[in-house]
Amino acid sequence: MAASKYYGLSIRNLAYRLRKFDEVLGKELVKTVLAHEQEIIEAITEDQLYERGVNGDDVEIMTYAPYAPSTVKRKIRKGQPYNRVTLRDTGEWYKSLRLVYDVDGFYLTSTDDKNKYLKDKYGPKILKLTKENLKNIIYKYIRPELSVKLKKYLQNGTEEE
């Protein structure tokens, strides 16, 4: 009763609007996730790879594919971290990452020539969010925005404001 009073709707109308929102939820989710492409990419490149040197399963990359001694020397010379695999040398690969959506879901891809080599050597999970970062993205960006969209949809009965 409180919901119908709050929105000034009958229960039947409210239920109808909820069903209609369910129909557009997938589209809204895609739009919301793609709107946060940069935050998702930074969670992977900055937190997972550069700061912690882990893949999407939260496994330290150094444990299964450590840097070659020549790479360690080059990293020391450049003043870059060498105690973990960051996959950053010039930063071009990081900058080339893009979030893509297709029938299989969301995934990161890259236009950089090194992408295939890096995925082959370090595994495709280097471009996967850890559970913790996925949770952070959902709670910080996705959930609040979808909640606002749901409230607007219930009030207006449409996607428009």
Language-model segments: which ranges?
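Short, Lys/Arg-rich flexible segments
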Residues: 1-161
